[in-house]
């Protein structure tokens, strides 16, 4: 069975924990888009591990971790991650494979990203400044440097020289920044080449072989669906397609080979950076939500904006991803709220609407229409049995399923992989729940 697991909001939904939990039964985990601009936090037996590029299956012995062609790969970020994992005794090089068609994220991409955000000032998009957007620009413009280019040093030098000269024009004459030296970039890549050369290969062919052996594969998304470059809250989006269709194009795996699409969603909503957020709470409730949820970016450390669950945006996410199941995370964050609110419609320019507008100026003016439910005000932290959950919490989950039309198959009640209620089996999971 082949399953896509992705975020349904603006990222930070808890994908890493769920992927890690499910990898017990899989042969491979695949990253298919994004870069090191988002982190997946895993907590196993109290020990925290943050992954940025390497798939979340790396903590399971024998699970292949594949970086697909849709990822933009920062060599220094990858090496730092490998070293951190090696220090914990994890044999990364034995499990990790990198698509030869994967584009590399290089120093001029980072320099351009930072220069652009600085120029925009108060109108900045709120990127992480890690070069993701410029790296994807080079890919689309067909001037990108790919992992396979590392295998041909002479050709690589010429490509780096041309690309650096091209980007230095913008850096020096438009943004008034110091130009970069192509030789130093090349030298860094040569050091990187020696370390990862054995891991470069044909990920698409490898996935095909696993499929023919009827092995289980997880395709792990980064960021969230509302940050999709085409279908998200443009221009306040990331630079890649974060929706289910990207799992095929970003890995070289045929779209008809996917069996399920699981969407990870918090029991509330968070967002980092600028952009419209209809249910955002700027009052004490929002501060309480952020504090209880420890809502700070795992990579950037930036505080996340918090708000009530948005049924309207979630329905859009379900539609564009063809979700077959929902994983509800961080339910325990809501434990101390006397009242829970669900946004069931928007009021835009005096009209009640049930679809999120693509017009961002209109979306920014939308106000949430709320349905109020009683809170449970008792701890759900660490529960593993659905029948032990407070009645009000079960009512909240049932109402979500009713409004969304998709079953909530897994509920996360804490950060550890053990803090989980599985209501519907995925692969051959032996953890089951009553109720």
Swiss-Prot record:
Which coenzymes or cofactors are required?
Mg(2+)
The pathway that the record names for this protein is: Purine metabolism; AMP biosynthesis via de novo pathway; AMP from IMP: step 1/2
Query: Can the keyword Nucleotide-binding be found in this entry's annotation?
Result: yes
Q: Per the annotation, which location comes first and is thus the protein's main one?
A: cytoplasm
Species name: Coxiella burnetii (strain RSA 493 / Nine Mile phase I)
Q: What is the lineage of its organism?
A: Bacteria, Pseudomonadati, Pseudomonadota, Gammaproteobacteria, Legionellales
Query: What are the entry keywords?
Result: Cytoplasm, GTP-binding, Ligase, Magnesium, Metal-binding, Nucleotide-binding, Purine biosynthesis
**Catalytic center residues:** 12 (proton acceptor), 40 (proton donor)
Q: Which SUPFAM superfamilies match?
A: P-loop containing nucleoside triphosphate hydrolases
The residues listed in the UniProt record as binding IMP, with positions renumbered to this chain, are: 12-15, 37-40, 128, 142, 223, 238, 302
Give the residues the record marks as binding substrate.
Answer: 298-304
Q: Please cite one Gene Ontology biological process associated with this protein.
A: 'de novo' AMP biosynthetic process
Name the residues that bind GTP.
11-17, 39-41, 304, 330-332, 412-414
The protein's name in its UniProt record: Adenylosuccinate synthetase
InterPro entries per record: Adenylosuccin_syn_GTP-bd (IPR018220), Adenylosuccin_syn_Lys_AS (IPR033128), Adenylosuccinate_synth_dom1 (IPR042109), Adenylosuccinate_synth_dom2 (IPR042110), Adenylosuccinate_synth_dom3 (IPR042111), Adenylosuccinate_synthetase (IPR001114), P-loop_NTPase (IPR027417)
Report the sequence similarity comment from the record: Belongs to the adenylosuccinate synthetase family.
One GO MF term attached to the UniProt entry? adenylosuccinate synthase activity
């Amino acid at each position: 069975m082949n399953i896509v697991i992705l975020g349904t909001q603006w990222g930070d939904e808890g994908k890493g924990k769920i992927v890690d939990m499910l990898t017990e039964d899989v042969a491979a985990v695949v990253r298919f888009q994004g870069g090191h601009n988002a982190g997946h936090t895993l907590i196993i037996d109290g020990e925290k591990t943050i992954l940025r590029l390497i798939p979340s299956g790396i903590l399971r012995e024998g699970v292949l971790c594949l970086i697909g062609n849709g990822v933009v790969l920062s060599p220094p970020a990858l090496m730092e991650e490998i070293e951190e994992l090696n220090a914990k005794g994890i044999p990364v090089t034995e499990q990790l494979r990198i698509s030869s068609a994967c584009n590399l994220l290089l120093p001029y991409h980072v320099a351009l990203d930072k220069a652009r955000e600085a120029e925009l000032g108060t109108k900045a998009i709120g990127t992480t400044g890690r070069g993701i957007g410029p790296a994807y620009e080079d890919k689309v413009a067909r001037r990108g440097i790919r992992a396979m280019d590392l295998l041909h040093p002479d050709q690589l030098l010429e490509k780096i020289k041309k690309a650096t000269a091209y980007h230095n024009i913008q850096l020096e004459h438009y943004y008034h920044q110091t130009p970069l030296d192509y030789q130093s970039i090349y030298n860094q890549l040569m050091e990187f080449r020696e370390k990862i050369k054995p891991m470069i290969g044909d990920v698409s062919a490898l996935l095909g072989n696993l499929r023919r052996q009827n092995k289980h594969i997880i395709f792990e998304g980064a960021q969230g669906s509302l940050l999709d470059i085409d279908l998200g809250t443009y221009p306040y989006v990331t630079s890649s397609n974060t929706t289910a269709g990207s799992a095929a194009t970003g890995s070289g795996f045929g779209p008809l080979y996917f069996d399920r699409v699981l969407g990870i969603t918090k029991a509330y909503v968070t967002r980092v950076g600028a952009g419209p957020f209809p249910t955002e709470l700027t009052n004490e409730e929002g501060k309480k939500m952020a504090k209880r949820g420890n809502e700070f970016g795992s990579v950037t450390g930036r505080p996340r904006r918090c708000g009530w669950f948005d049924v309207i945006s979630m329905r859009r996410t379900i539609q564009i991803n063809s979700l077959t199941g929902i994983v509800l995370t961080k339910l325990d964050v809501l434990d101390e709220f006397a009242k829970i609110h669900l946004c069931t419609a928007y009021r835009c320019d005096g009209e009640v609407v049930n679809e999120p507008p693509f017009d961002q100026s209109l979306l920014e003016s939308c106000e949430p229409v709320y349905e109020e439910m009683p809170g449970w005000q008792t701890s759900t932290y660490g529960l593993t049995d659905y029948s032990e959950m407070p009645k009000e919490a079960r009512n909240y989950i049932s109402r979500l399923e009713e409004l969304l039309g998709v079953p909530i198959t897994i509920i996360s009640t804490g950060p550890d992989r053990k803090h989980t209620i599985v209501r519907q089996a995925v692969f051959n999971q032996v953890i089951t729940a009553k109720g």
